[in-house]
């Protein structure tokens, strides 16, 4: 991953997740296994996942990809398909995702 001064171009994706209350610990475990793999993808400039201190079922993702193609590639990786699409998403009560560009 590049430092923050080197990432001011590309596609920024933010996501907010809310896990089902009984699934929080499982979601944390899945994300801990997923994150290092996502951070090593060639098109990823930054990838951070945060958990709320006051509402532990809520998660915030900050992702910077080289471009839209890198984001599309990310969603086709085995770790995304298995850990996120296959395991994490069914454990969520809510998911929002937005794409941004640097100004």
Where are each of the predicted segments found?
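N-terminal first-folded block
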Residues: 3-39
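Short, well-ordered beta-strand segments in beta-rich or mixed alpha/beta enzyme
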Residues: 11-18, 48-75
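Extended aliphatic helical segments
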Residues: 12-13, 24-28, 44, 64, ...
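Short, glycine- and small/hydrophobic-rich beta-strand elements in well-ordered beta-sheets
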Residues: 36-59, 100
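An amphipathic, aromatic/His-enriched active-site/gating alpha helix that lines ligand/cofactor pockets
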Residues: 39-45, 64-98
């Amino acid at each position: 991953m590049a430092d923050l001064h080197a990432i001011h171009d590309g596609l920024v994706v933010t996501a907010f997740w809310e896990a089902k209350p009984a699934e929080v610990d499982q979601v944390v475990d899945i994300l801990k296994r997923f994150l290092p793999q996502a951070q090593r993808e060639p098109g990823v400039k930054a990838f951070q996942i945060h958990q709320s201190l006051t509402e532990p079922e809520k998660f915030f993702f900050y992702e910077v990809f080289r471009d839209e193609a890198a984001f599309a590639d990310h969603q086709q990786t085995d770790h995304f398909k298995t850990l996120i699409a296959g395991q994490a998403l069914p454990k969520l009560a809510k998911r929002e995702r937005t794409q941004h560009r640097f100004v």
